[in-house]
Swiss-Prot record:
Name the UniProt record assigns to this protein: Cytochrome bo(3) ubiquinol oxidase subunit 1
Species the sequence originates in: Buchnera aphidicola subsp. Acyrthosiphon pisum (strain APS) (Acyrthosiphon pisum symbiotic bacterium)
Subcellular location: Cell membrane
Binding site residues for Cu(2+): 284, 333-334
UniProt enzyme class: translocase
Cytoplasmic topological intervals: 36-58, 128-145, 211-232, 299-309, 368-380, 435-456, 515-586, 630-662
The family this protein is said to belong to: Belongs to the heme-copper respiratory oxidase family.
Other information: Ubiquinol oxidase catalyzes the terminal step in the electron transport chain.
Domain of life: Bacteria
Reactions this protein catalyses: 2 a ubiquinol + O2 + n H(+)(in) = 2 a ubiquinone + 2 H2O + n H(+)(out)
Length: 662
C-alpha cells in the first residue's frame, strides 16, 4: 500500500540527522502553535496564502529564500568543519554518505531555493511598478508558481528525515544517478524537487514575459524601459527557453530509473554524456537567469545614489541582449575534459571569452555613472561596490577557466568552487541584498536601519574573501572538490582560514536579522511618507510606500526614460493633485487553488519518490481537476471604488505636502 516506504526509511542510527529533523519539527510546531494562539490562521489564509497581489507574493518569496538560506548555510558550515577536522588527521563527524547528501543538498538549496526565490521575489515586486501596471498578466499563475516552489522545498526537506537525499552532486550526473549506482530514493527526491520547482519557474517566466511585453504604461517603448525591466525581460526569455530543457532532461532520467529505459546508461544505446550536455544547456543560462536581474538592480542603485542619469543606457541594453544570446553557446566549457576534441573546445573557449566583453561593458558603465556623481554611501551602494570587486575577480578567473589547457589542470578543483562562489555570492547574493535595502520601503513603508545594514555588509565582504580566496590557492595546490576524508594535512591551514571566513559570513547574516528586527521596532521613526525616500528616477517611486493594492490610481503616461525624475522638476505634485479624476479600478480576486494544487503536487512528488501508485494517481488527478475548476471560474475580479481610491490618494498627497514637496 505504501510502496517502498517503511519505518526503516527513518534514519534512527544517524544522530545528527535525527536531532536536526526533530528540531525542524519542533520549530514548525512552535510556529503553528503561536499562530493558533493568536488566532491568525484566517488572516494568513485570506491575506497571504490566497493572495494574488504581486507585492505580497514578493514578500513570501523573500521569506522562503531566507528560511532556506539558513538550511543551506548550516550545510556549508558542516562541510567546511568536516574538511578542517579531516585535514587535521581525524575521521570527522560526517560519514561519507551523509557528507555527500549535504554536499548535494547545499547546491540544490542555494540555487533553486535561495538565489531563484530572491531574484523572482525582486522581479515580482519591481516589474509591475516600474512599467506602470497594476499587477502581473496572470495573477493566479503568480500565486501557483510560488506555492509550487514551496512544495518542492518541503519535499526536499522531507528527505532529511524520511529516506535520504541524493549523493550525486547537485547536477546528478549519470551513471552515478542511475538506478544501478543509486538504488535508493535520494535521486528520486532530487528529481521531483527540481521537477516541481522547474514547472513553477517556467510559469513565472511566461507570466513576467507577457507582463513586460503587453502591460507597459502608454508611451513606454522598449528603449524607455528601466534597465531592471530590460534585464528581467531577458531573464524571462532565458527561463522560457531553458527550463523546458531541464524538465525534459529530468523526464528522461526518470524513465531510466523507473522504467529501465536507456537514455543515459553506459549500455544498450545509452549515452551518459548526452545528459551532461542537456543539463548544462539549461545550467549555463541558469547562471545568467540569476545574474541578469541583479545587473538591473545595480543599474538602478548607482543611478539613484549617484544623482546622475545612467551612463551608456543603450550600450547596457545591447550588452544585456548580447549576454542573453551568447549564454546559449558556452555550455560546453563546463566539461572541456569530456573529450569532444580540440576544435570543439576551442570554439566554446572563444565564445566564453567573448561573453566576458558585454559584462565588462556593464561594469565600466556603472563605474562611469559613479564617477563625479554626488554619491550617497547608502548600504545599497556598498553592496554594489562589493559586487564590483568580487565579481571582477570571479570574472577574471572564469576567463582563465575558459582556456581549455588551463581548465584541464583546474577542472574539478577548489579553484572552480571559488570561481562560481565569486560569481554567485559576489554577484547574485550581493545584488539581491542591494535590491532589498533599496526597495524595502516600497513594500513596508519604512526604511531599513543603516547602521546594522552596513555592519552586515562588512562582515559579509570580509567573510567572503576569507572563505573563498584560500580556495583558489587550494585548487592550485591540487585539492579537488567533494573531499571529506583523508585530506592532505598541508591543506589544513587554508581550510581553517576558509572556515573562519564562513563564521564571519554567519555573523553577517545575524547582523541582517538584527537589522530587520531593529527596523521593525523603530519603524515609526523611519517612515517613508513620500514614497520616494531616495529621490528615485523610475515609476515605482511615484506611488506611496507601501504601494497601494492597485499600484497606480491613474496609469502614468511615459514620455522619457527617467520620466518620474524629469516630472519632479517644478510643481509636479501640485499639478497632479489638481488634475486627477478618479475612477473605479478592477483588481484580481484572491484564490486558494494555487495553494491546494501545491499540496497535491507535494503528495504527487512524495508518492512518486516512494512508488505509492494509488496516491500518485489520485494527487495527479486532483491537480488536473483543480486546474479545470480554475478555468471555469469567471468571478475573478472585484472593484475598488473611486471614493475609496480618492481617500487613499489624498492621504498620500497630505504626506507629500508635509514633506514640503511641490
Amino acid at each position: 500500500m505504501f510502496g517502498k516506504l517503511t519505518f526503516d526509511a527513518i534514519p534512527y542510527h544517524e544522530p545528527i540527522i535525527m536531532i536536526t529533523y526533530i528540531a525542524i519539527i519542533l520549530i514548525a510546531l512552535c510556529i503553528a502553535s503561536t499562530i493558533t494562539y493568536y488566532k491568525k490562521w484566517k488572516y494568513l489564509w485570506y491575506e497571504w496564502f490566497t493572495t494574488v497581489d504581486h507585492k505580497k507574493i514578493s514578500i513570501m518569496y523573500g521569506i522562503l529564500a531566507f528560511v532556506m538560506l539558513f538550511r543551506g548555510f548550516v550545510d556549508a558550515i558542516l562541510m567546511r568543519t568536516q574538511q578542517v577536522v579531516a585535514s587535521a588527521g581525524f575521521k570527522g563527524f560526517l560519514p561519507p554518505h551523509h557528507y555527500d547528501q549535504i554536499f548535494t543538498a547545499h547546491g540544490v538549496i542555494m540555487i533553486f531555493f535561495v538565489a531563484m526565490p530572491l531574484v523572482i521575489g525582486l522581479m515580482n515586486l519591481v516589474i509591475p511598478l516600474q512599467i506602470g501596471a497594476r499587477d502581473v498578466a496572470f495573477p493566479f499563475l503568480n500565486n501557483l508558481s510560488f506555492w509550487l516552489n514551496v512544495s518542492s522545498a518541503v519535499l526536499l526537506t522531507l528527505s532529511l528525515g524520511i529516506g535520504e537525499f541524493a549523493q550525486t552532486g547537485w547536477l546528478a550526473y549519470p551513471p552515478l544517478s542511475g538506478i544501478k549506482y543509486s538504488s535508493g530514493v535520494g535521486v528520486d527526491y532530487w528529481i521531483w524537487s527540481l521537477q516541481i520547482s522547474g514547472v513553477g519557474t517556467t510559469l513565472t517566466g511566461i507570466n513576467f514575459l507577457v507582463t513586460i511585453l503587453k502591460m507597459r504604461a502608454p508611451g513606454m517603448s522598449f528603449f524607455k524601459m528601466p534597465v531592471f525591466t530590460w534585464t528581467s525581460l531577458c531573464t524571462n526569455i532565458l527561463i522560457v527557453i531553458s527550463f523546458p530543457v531541464l524538465t525534459v532532461t529530468l523526464v528522461l532520467l526518470t524513465l531510466d530509473r523507473y522504467f529501465n529505459f536507456h537514455f543515459f546508461t553506459n549500455d544498450l544505446g545509452g549515452n551518459a554524456m548526452m545528459y551532461v550536455n542537456l543539463i548544462w544547456i539549461w545550467g549555463h543560462p541558469e547562471v545568467y537567469i540569476l545574474v541578469l536581474p541583479v545587473f538591473g538592480v545595480f543599474s538602478e542603485v548607482v543611478a539613484t545614489f549617484s544623482k546622475k542619469r545612467l551612463f551608456g543606457y543603450v550600450s547596457l541594453v545591447w550588452a544585456t541582449l548580447s549576454i542573453t544570446i551568447l549564454s546559449f553557446i558556452v555550455w560546453l566549457h563546463h566539461f572541456f575534459t569530456m573529450g569532444a576534441g580540440a576544435d570543439v573546445n576551442t570554439f566554446f573557449g572563444i565564445t566564453t571569452m567573448i561573453i566576458a566583453i558585454p559584462t565588462g561593458v556593464k561594469i565600466f558603465n556603472w563605474l562611469f555613472t559613479i564617477y563625479q556623481g554626488r554619491v550617497h554611501m547608502h548600504s545599497s551602494i556598498l553592496w554594489t561596490l562589493g559586487f564590483l570587486v568580487t565579481f571582477s575577480i570571479g570574472g577574471m578567473t572564469g576567463v582563465l577557466l575558459s582556456v581549455p589547457p588551463a581548465d584541464f589542470v583546474l577542472h574539478n578543483s577548489l579553484f572552480l568552487v571559488a570561481h562560481f562562489h565569486n560569481v554567485i555570492i559576489g554577484g547574485v547574493v550581493f545584488g539581491c541584498f542591494a535590491g532589498i535595502n533599496y526597495w524595502f520601503p516600497k513594500l513596508f513603508g519604512f526604511v531599513l536601519n543603516e547602521i546594522w545594514g552596513k555592519r552586515a555588509f562588512w562582515f559579509w565582504i570580509i567573510g567572503f574573501f576569507l572563505a573563498f580566496i584560500p580556495l583558489y590557492f587550494l585548487g592550485l595546490m591540487g585539492m579537488t572538490r567533494r573531499l571529506s576524508q583523508n585530506i592532505d594535512s598541508e591543506f589544513h591551514m587554508l581550510l581553517c582560514i576558509a572556515a573562519i571566513g564562513a563564521c564571519f559570513i554567519g555573523i553577517g547574516i545575524i547582523c541582517q536579522v538584527i537589522q530587520f528586527f531593529i527596523s521593525i521596532k523603530e519603524r515609526r521613526h523611519n517612515l517613508d511618507l513620500t514614497g520616494d525616500p531616495w529621490d528615485g528616477r523610475t515609476l515605482e517611486w511615484s506611488t506611496s510606500s507601501p504601494a497601494p493594492l492597485y499600484n497606480f490610481a491613474i496609469i502614468p503616461k511615459v514620455e522619457d526614460r527617467d520620466d518620474f525624475w524629469r516630472n519632479k522638476e517644478g510643481q509636479h505634485y501640485n499639478k497632479l493633485i489638481n488634475s486627477i479624476n478618479y475612477h473605479d479600478i478592477h483588481m484580481p480576486k484572491n484564490t486558494g487553488l494555487g495553494f491546494m494544487i501545491s499540496i497535491f503536487s507535494l503528495f504527487f512528488g512524495f508518492s512518486a519518490v516512494w512508488h505509492i501508485t494509488w496516491l500518485c494517481i489520485l494527487s495527479f488527478l486532483a491537480i488536473i481537476i483543480s486546474l479545470f475548476i480554475n478555468s471555469l471560474n469567471e468571478d475573478t475580479e472585484y472593484t475598488i471604488s473611486a471614493e475609496e481610491i480618492k481617500k487613499i490618494e489624498h492621504q498620500y498627497w497630505k504626506n507629500i505636502q508635509k514633506a514640503g514637496l511641490k
